[in-house]
Amino acid sequence: MLSPKRTRFRKQHRGRMKGIAFRGNRICFGRYALQALEPAWITSRQIEAGRRAMTRNARRGGKIWVRIFPDKPVTLRPTETRMGSGKGSPEYWVAVVKPGRILYEMGGVAENIARKAISIAASKMPIRTQFIISG
């Protein structure tokens, strides 16, 4: 599972996901990519599940790049706890994804294999996505 080695602060505000992604919205490494169409928090488990699905489907050929990283801690309070007494402890990590952001890239395989592998990874994501080709 992906997570930062160390952070400056243990807890973060939730924040807002306004607008579209201006960074990380172009294909940089591979030839095929999976692009987000909706804003969402994507957990490190979902990122890992998508990556595993792609590698399993592409077999030995091809290379995969994960273009998002979960750097935001999400805190949860213990169940059946009364309100107050501070913020909960960090439970898991999420990547903040805006529309237009590239999630995964793939190269070194035929288009039909890439399309199939990326569609399986897309089914693991909690948002609508699209398959795009560079050039």
Curated annotation (Swiss-Prot):
Disulfide bonds: none annotated. Its main location: plastid. GO terms for biological process: translation. SUPFAM superfamilies: Ribosomal protein L16p/L10e. It comes from the Eukaryota. One of its GO terms (molecular function) is rRNA binding. Part of the 50S ribosomal subunit. This is Large ribosomal subunit protein uL16c. It comes from Manihot esculenta. The gene is rpl16.
